[in-house]
């Protein structure tokens, strides 16, 4: 109720020109009041249009400027009214214009704001399109709802983009950290390679220096002796020529024969163009080998040897080591001497605890192969064998088999893929070979192909990819250099690791994954 009275009072003290509360109010003789600035501006406008009489902007009654009087009473009311504010509770009941105190019932489309009827008539909104709030509220409610849904959709997209960029950021950090680790590891490997190559090359040069200088020193000594001998001979001849006739002829034939028969011994020389030229190692190739070896080593399995009853293939208690023991020491056929065993044939293969033994004791050819106890029927498998200091060995994989009455055991010594053997070997200390299927030239024996091995391996890695049907051999001593790879292997049955120490008593050892 009080707010209604205040609003009515406010209407009475509002300037009809600016529609604001009166400022320094002046009253005309007709009783209407105006702001001093507003009525002065109206007076100047009349002078501009050369109007002889001034009239009230509201009632158009003429007045003279000297009749305008300050309205102190209205000024006091305005001052008090400016100090009065509606209570919060009353303000919540009715929305009123902050400028005019009128109800906010209209909407200005151009300015997109709610106004009162006095605002609509003011200079600020003159000529604008205005509507009752009820007329446009539903339309704008729909628009705002559509905008809200669109914004929520964009918010979801923004959140997804934010999550994606965070995920990408994390992925990049992981990848870069991984690459940094790999780079450090690769360069560490390169440093190891360079250190090893440098040490090896320096050792070769030192050996070359030792051998050549030793030979040249020997030649130098011989040349010194030869020169000294010639000096002595020349001195003898000069003495004879300068001496008496008796000295000249005494033993003259002997000394002439010594001169005529003397052959000048030439020293042994070494041509520099025949020297081995040092070439920097192929670091990229070595690094690729390292990476391949690192990859296959992820499939390292702990292989042990199957128990067997082969007396000359001795397996250690830990089932990791097999060595050859001369059967002449352990076996003597009834009525025979050890010497008569040299032509016996004794060939044995082992699968688990089962052994296959040829009873034919003629043309004695020792076959001491043993199998690992773990069968391979799928997947990828890798293991390493220590063959250091051995002068002969055979290793690889062998297909499991069960002998029958028709099985020709002599074929067991034919290390051929068609018989289930994918193996490589060493003989005579430095001759490496791969055993292939027999050819027309060797119909009953494996076709042995020499392998070029620059650095003799102390340890050999074996990798079997059952699904890819491949068996690969790596020279661990030479940075994982690939020695040989069998492709298109016909794995029709389980295969087993195969080790044969041959006639070398130095053991072969299966390395543990932690070694």
Curated annotation (Swiss-Prot):
It catalyses: S-ubiquitinyl-[E2 ubiquitin-conjugating enzyme]-L-cysteine + [acceptor protein]-L-lysine = [E2 ubiquitin-conjugating enzyme]-L-cysteine + N(6)-ubiquitinyl-[acceptor protein]-L-lysine. Gene3D superfamilies: 2.60.120.920, Classic Zinc Finger, Zinc/RING finger domain, C3HC4 (zinc finger). GO terms for cellular component: nucleus; P-body. Transmembrane segments: none annotated. The keyword Flavoprotein does not apply. GO terms for biological process: activation of innate immune response; autophagy; defense response to virus; innate immune response; positive regulation of canonical NF-kappaB signal transduction; positive regulation of MAPK cascade; positive regulation of NF-kappaB transcription factor activity; protein K63-linked ubiquitination. Degraded in a proteasome-independent fashion in the absence of viral infection but in a proteasome-dependent fashion following exposure to restriction sensitive virus. Autoubiquitinated in a RING finger- and UBE2D2-dependent manner. Monoubiquitinated by TRIM21. Deubiquitinated by Yersinia YopJ. Ubiquitination may not lead to proteasomal degradation. Its EC number is 2.3.2.27. SMART domains: BBOX, RING, SPRY. Residues 283-515 form the B30.2/SPRY domain. Pathway: Protein modification; protein ubiquitination. Can form homodimers and homotrimers. In addition to lower-order dimerization, also exhibits a higher-order multimerization and both low- and high-order multimerizations are essential for its restriction activity. Interacts with BTBD1 and BTBD2. Interacts with PSMC4, PSMC5, PSMD7 and HSPA8/HSC70. Interacts (via B30.2/SPRY domain) with HSPA1A/B. Interacts with PSMC2, MAP3K7/TAK1, TAB2 and TAB3. Interacts with SQSTM1. Interacts with TRIM6 and TRIM34. Interacts with ULK1 (phosphorylated form), GABARAP, GABARAPL1, GABARAPL2, MAP1LC3A, MAP1LC3C and BECN1. The B box-type zinc finger domain and the coiled-coil domain contribute to the higher and low order multimerization respectively which is essential for restriction activity. The coiled coil domain is important for higher order multimerization by promoting the initial dimerization. Belongs to the TRIM/RBCC family. This is Tripartite motif-containing protein 5.
């Amino acid at each position: 109720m009080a707010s209604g009275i205040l609003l009515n009072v406010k209407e009475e003290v509002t300037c009809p020109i600016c529609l604001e509360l009166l400022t320094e109010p002046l009253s005309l003789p007709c009783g209407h009041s105006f702001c001093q600035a507003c009525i002065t501006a109206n007076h100047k406008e009349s002078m501009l249009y050369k109007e002889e009489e001034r009239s009230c902007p509201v009632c158009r009654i003429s007045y003279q400027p000297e009749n305008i009087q300050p309205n102190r009473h209205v000024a006091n009311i305005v001052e008090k009214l400016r100090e009065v504010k509606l209570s919060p509770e009353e303000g919540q009941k009715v929305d009123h214009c902050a400028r005019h105190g009128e109800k906010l019932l209209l909407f200005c489309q151009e300015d997109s704001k709610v106004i009162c009827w006095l605002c609509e008539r003011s200079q600020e909104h003159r000529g604008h399109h205005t509507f009752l709030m009820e007329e446009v509220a539903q339309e704008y409610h729909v628009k705002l709802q559509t905008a809200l849904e669109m914004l929520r959709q964009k918010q979801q997209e923004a959140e997804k983009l934010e999550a994606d960029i965070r995920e990408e950021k994390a992925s990049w950090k992981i990848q870069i950290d991984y690459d940094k680790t790999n780079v450090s590891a690769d360069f560490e490997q390169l440093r190891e390679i360079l250190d090893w190559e440098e040490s090896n090359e320096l050792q070769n040069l030192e050996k070359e220096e030792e051998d050549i200088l030793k030979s040249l020193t020997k030649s130098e000594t011989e040349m010194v002796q030869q020169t000294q001998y010639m000096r002595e001979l020349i001195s003898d001849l000069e003495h004879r020529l300068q001496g008496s006739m008796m000295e000249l002829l005494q033993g003259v034939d002997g000394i002439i024969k010594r001169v005529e028969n003397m052959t000048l011994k030439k020293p042994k020389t070494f041509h520099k163009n025949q020297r081995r030229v040092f070439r920097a190692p192929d670091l990229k190739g070595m690094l690729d080998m390292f990476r391949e070896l690192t990859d296959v080593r992820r499939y390292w399995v702990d292989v042990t040897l199957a128990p067997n009853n082969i007396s000359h293939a001795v397996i250690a208690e830990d089932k990791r080591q097999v060595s050859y023991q001369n059967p002449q020491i352990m076996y003597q056929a009834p009525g025979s001497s050890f010497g008569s065993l040299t032509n016996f044939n004794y060939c044995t293969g082992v699968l688990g605890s089962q052994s296959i033994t040829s009873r034919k004791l003629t043309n004695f050819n020792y076959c001491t192969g043993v199998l690992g106890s773990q069968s391979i029927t799928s997947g990828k498998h890798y293991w390493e064998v220590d063959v250091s200091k051995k002068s002969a060995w055979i290793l690889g994989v062998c297909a499991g088999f069960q002998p029958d009455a028709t099985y020709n055991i002599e074929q067991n010594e034919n290390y051929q893929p068609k018989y289930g053997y994918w193996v490589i070997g060493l003989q005579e200390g430095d001759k490496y070979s791969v055993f292939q299927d027999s050819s027309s030239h060797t119909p009953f024996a494996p076709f042995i192909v020499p392998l070029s091995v620059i650095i003799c391996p102390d340890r050999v890695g074996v990798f079997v990819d059952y699904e890819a049907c491949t068996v690969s051999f790596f020279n661990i001593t030479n940075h994982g250099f690939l020695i040989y790879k069998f492709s298109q292997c016909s794995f029709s049955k389980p295969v087993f690791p195969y080790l044969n120490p041959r006639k070398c008593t130095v053991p072969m050892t299966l390395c543990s994954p932690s070694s």
